[in-house]
Design a protein with these regions (language model features):
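Catalytic center-proximal scaffold of phosphoryl-transfer enzymes
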Residues: 1-282
Length: 282
């Protein structure tokens, strides 16, 4: 993150130095940041080619207005976009007509309908269940929370389980969910949760048990956005759209490097070297 800020608290990428996920960026390197757009687009193409894509979003500040930072990731790459909207058009534009096999996200409506199947983040739903429990529901939420934690435990054990065993667990969990949805909570929050699960979630809870390369939670997407949340609080955002786009490209390169066991410094240097290497070979 380029964390050096101006007197009004807004970050400018032309400042003398800063940091990218804790990495110092020297003055001479900042002029090269425009060169990272092409490597970032190669990362986007890698994510689009994946059968399983996970996505999340968090707010950003650009020229004093609320924008949104989106992340689209697969096992080996993460692409960041900072856009003026939280609408469905952002993932639609990112995909460019591609339809992956599975999409992993929270329950935001803008995240729906982009893949053949959808896996809701079970960690989010476990928190929703705990909220209903804290507000007095004893009929649906406690058992629903236990069911989701059971599903996550099966997910962690998949490396040691045969495909047939995983399929049996999925059928068992689906039967238990069906019985749970027959319950009638009397507490308001319990009813809201049960109705939401019945209407929107019942076919999006255990999709990850159909694929070994899918996860039950969206924790990796949240982790990819965490440095940006800190950045927003420290700097109060960007004074230009150019700065926001450059920062998103940097996030793409650094987080993709992390997923491939490369340091932020190595990932950025490799990205900046790519155009020169291609030119040399031309």
């Amino acid at each position: 993150m380029i964390s050096k800020s101006t007197s009004d608290g807004a970050a400018t990428p032309r400042q003398a130095s800063g940091s990218v996920s804790g990495l110092a960026v020297m003055k001479g390197e900042l002029g090269s940041l425009q060169a990272i757009a092409a490597p970032a687009e190669r990362i986007a193409a890698e994510v689009r080619a994946s059968e399983v894509i996970a996505s999340d979003e968090t707010s950003a500040r650009v020229k004093g207005k609320t924008w949104w930072q989106w992340t689209f990731g697969c096992a080996t790459a993460v692409y960041h976009v900072i856009a003026p909207t939280r609408g469905k058009c952002v993932p639609t534009d990112f995909l460019g007509g591609v339809k992956p096999k599975m999409w992993l996200s929270d329950r935001l409506a803008a995240q729906l309908g982009h893949a053949e199947e959808h896996q809701f983040c079970l960690a989010h739903l476990i928190r929703d269940a705990q909220y209903a429990i804290d507000h007095g529901d004893t009929i649906f939420a406690p058992a629903f929370k236990a069911l989701l934690k059971d599903a996550c435990a099966v997910g962690r054990r998949r490396p040691d389980l045969a495909d047939a065993t995983i399929a049996a667990h999925r059928r068992r969990l689906e039967r238990q969910l069906e019985r749970l949805l027959a319950r009638k909570p009397t507490d308001t929050e319990g009813r809201k949760l049960r109705d939401a699960v019945y209407v929107d979630c019942s076919d999006k809870l255990f999709v990850f048990l159909k694929r070994r390369d899918a996860e039950p939670t969206n924790n990796e997407s949240e982790r990819a956005l965490r440095p940006s949340v800190i950045f927003r609080k420290v700097t109060n955002g960007f004074r230009s759209e150019w700065g926001a786009k450059t920062y998103a490209a940097l996030c793409s390169i650094v987080e993709t490097g992390r997923r491939n066991s490369r340091s932020a410094l190595t990932a950025i240097r490799e990205a900046l070297a790519l155009p020169a290497a291609h030119a040399a070979g031309a």
